[in-house]
Amino acid sequence: MAVPRRKTSPSRRGMRRSADAIKKPTYVEDKDSGELRRPHHLDLKTGMYKGRQVLKKKDA
């Protein structure tokens, strides 16, 4: 059976667990509409992504 050779230090254990934390999502302000959106995602109101129209605009 595999057994660790050395005890894991609290510092190393904490560094390993730091990736498990829940991080809040980041938002950026859209240049054209001023709406908040996720980075690298399209704007659902305008249907634009990277300056191109990829979806038809929603009619309100």
Swiss-Prot record:
Residues 17-44 have a biased composition (Basic and acidic residues). This is Large ribosomal subunit protein bL32. Residues 1-60 are annotated as: Disordered. Disulfide bonds: none annotated. One of its GO terms (cellular component) is large ribosomal subunit. It comes from the Bacteria. Keywords: Ribonucleoprotein, Ribosomal protein. Belongs to the bacterial ribosomal protein bL32 family. GO terms for molecular function: structural constituent of ribosome. Residues 1-16 have a biased composition (Basic residues). The keyword Magnesium does not apply. It comes from Bradyrhizobium sp. (strain ORS 278). One of its GO terms (biological process) is translation. The gene is rpmF.
